[in-house]
A protein has these predicted regions:
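Active-site loop segments of alpha/beta catalytic cores
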Residues: 1-147
Length: 147
């Protein structure tokens, strides 16, 4: 279950945890088979990050939020799924539970995400096509940042 993710975070023991099987199993099976292992990993790691396969893992969200030591949830929209913008209430629930969020966004998704979520603990990666576009993105984020 250990994977490497270059997320720009400095930690002695940082790792991306995931359970891709969870998209095919019930909540009961997830709680029985995956949660004990995820809990052990959270206890071991200094900076545990969970790779969350968007809408397909939403049924397991409450279990994941119960992992007290889980620091970050990386929301991943699987090909063909709607943008993370469509799941603002779910992302807000993650923040309310004290979890940071890591998103892979397109430039046009930044504004609604920044307006709908607190900037505290919000991390995202976005590709710019030029230096000018990157500068505009930074200015937009600075303008829209809020608690």
């Amino acid at each position: 279950m250990f994977c490497r993710l270059a997320a720009g975070m400095v930690a002695r023991l940082m790792s991306q945890m995931q359970c891709d099987l969870s998209v095919m199993i019930s909540e009961n099976d997830f709680n029985t088979f995956a949660m004990p292992e995820l809990r052990k990993q959270c206890d071991f790691l200094q900076f545990p990050l969970y790779h969350f396969d968007g809408q397909e893992q939403r049924r397991h969200l409450q279990s994941l939020l119960s992992l007290e030591k889980l620091r970050v949830i990386q929301w991943t929209s699987v090909v063909g799924q709607p943008s993370p913008v469509e799941y603002l209430p779910t992302l807000q629930a993650m923040q309310k539970a004290g979890k940071s969020i890591f998103l892979m966004l397109k430039p046009y998704e930044i504004e609604p995400i920044m307006q709908g979520l607190s900037s505290k603990g919000l991390h995202f990666s976005v590709e710019a096509q030029s230096v000018e576009e990157a500068d505009a993105i930074v200015k937009l984020v600075e303008k829209l940042s809020h608690e």
